[in-house]
C-alpha cells in the first residue's frame, strides 16, 4: 500500500484502507479462513485472491443488472476499490433450501427446497454471536426504518433471482447466502462486503448420485478437505462462463 492510504479496519477476512480526502477505500482480501465466529481459524495460500476475483466478477454482473453496490473495480488480484460506506449492522441471510441453522432451529429436514425464499435478519455483533432478529426488534433497535428494511428485503430478493440464474449457469445450486448493506456518501443504501464461497452456500449440480458436494466454506467448517480446490473450481467456472 502507498502513503496515500490509511489503514482503518481489519476483520476476519479483509483489511480496509482509506484514501485520503476521498470516499473510496481499498479492500484487501486475506488468506484467513474462519468459522464459528472465528473459534476455528486457518490460513490457505491464495484464498484472498480467489475471493477477491470471484467477488469482483459477481459485483460486475450485479451492477450490469442495476443492483447498486459499493464495488468500483479491481486494484490487483487480492484488492478491490470500493465506495466508503457506513455498514448497517444487519446480516441479511436468504435461504432457498433448508440447511444449517434453519434446520437446527426448526423441524425442517436438511435439503428441503423452500416453497419461496426465506429472508432472516441477524444483528451484526460477534460478542452476541449475531442473534436472529424479528422486524419488531429491528424497529426497537432503530437499525433501519420500515421503508429501508423493505428496500433491503426487495433488493435481496432481486439479487437472489439474479444469483440463482448466474450460479445455475455454472452448474451450482445457490442454497443460501449472506449479504451486508451500507449507506454511501449520498445516503443511498448499497450492497457491500463480498459475494464469494465464504458467504454463499453452493452445491455442485454436476453430481449425479444425489450426494451433496459443497463448493464453499462448509468444506473448511466441516473438515471436508479440498477447500482451496473448491474455491478454485468456482473461479474457473465463472471465468469459463463470462
Swiss-Prot record:
Keywords: ATP-binding, Ligase, Nucleotide-binding, Purine biosynthesis. Disulfide bonds: none annotated. Gene3D superfamilies: ATP-grasp fold, B domain, Phosphorylase Kinase, domain 1. Coiled coil: none annotated. It holds the Pfam family SAICAR_synt. PANTHER family: MULTIFUNCTIONAL PROTEIN ADE2, SI:DKEY-6E2.2. Pathway: Purine metabolism; IMP biosynthesis via de novo pathway; 5-amino-1-(5-phospho-D-ribosyl)imidazole-4-carboxamide from 5-amino-1-(5-phospho-D-ribosyl)imidazole-4-carboxylate: step 1/2. The keyword Chloroplast does not apply. One of its GO terms (biological process) is cobalamin biosynthetic process. It catalyses: 5-amino-1-(5-phospho-D-ribosyl)imidazole-4-carboxylate + L-aspartate + ATP = (2S)-2-[5-amino-1-(5-phospho-beta-D-ribosyl)imidazole-4-carboxamido]succinate + ADP + phosphate + 2 H(+). It comes from the Bacteria. It is an enzyme of class 6 (ligase). This is Phosphoribosylaminoimidazole-succinocarboxamide synthase. GO terms for molecular function: ATP binding; phosphoribosylaminoimidazolesuccinocarboxamide synthase activity.
Amino acid at each position: 500500500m502507498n502513503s496515500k492510504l490509511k489503514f482503518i479496519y481489519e476483520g476476519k477476512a479483509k483489511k480496509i484502507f482509506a484514501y485520503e480526502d476521498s470516499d473510496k477505500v481499498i479492500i484487501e482480501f486475506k488468506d484467513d479462513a474462519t468459522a464459528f465466529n472465528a473459534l476455528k481459524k486457518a490460513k490457505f495460500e491464495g484464498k484472498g485472491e480467489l475471493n477477491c476475483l470471484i467477488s469482483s466478477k459477481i459485483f460486475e454482473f450485479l451492477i450490469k443488472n442495476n443492483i447498486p453496490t459499493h464495488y468500483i473495480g479491481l486494484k490487483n488480484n487480492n484488492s478491490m476499490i470500493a465506495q466508503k460506506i457506513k455498514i448497517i449492522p444487519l446480516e441479511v441471510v436468504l435461504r432457498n433450501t433448508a440447511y444449517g441453522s434453519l434446520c437446527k432451529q426448526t423441524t425442517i429436514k436438511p435439503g428441503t427446497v423452500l416453497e419461496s425464499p426465506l429472508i432472516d435478519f441477524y444483528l451484526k455483533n460477534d460478542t452476541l454471536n449475531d442473534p436472529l432478529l424479528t422486524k419488531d426488534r429491528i424497529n426497537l433497535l432503530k437499525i433501519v426504518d420500515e421503508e429501508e428494511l423493505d428496500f433491503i428485503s426487495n433488493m435481496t430478493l432481486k439479487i437472489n433471482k439474479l444469483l440463482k440464474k448466474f450460479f445455475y449457469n455454472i452448474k451450482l445450486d445457490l442454497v443460501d447466502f449472506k449479504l451486508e448493506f451500507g449507506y454511501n456518501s449520498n445516503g443511498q443504501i448499497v450492497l457491500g462486503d463480498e459475494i464469494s464461497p465464504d458467504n454463499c452456500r453452493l452445491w455442485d449440480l454436476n453430481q449425479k448420485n444425489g450426494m451433496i458436494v459443497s463448493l464453499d466454506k462448509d468444506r473448511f467448517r466441516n473438515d471436508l478437505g479440498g477447500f482451496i480446490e473448491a474455491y478454485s473450481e468456482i473461479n474457473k467456472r465463472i471465468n469459463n462462463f463470462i
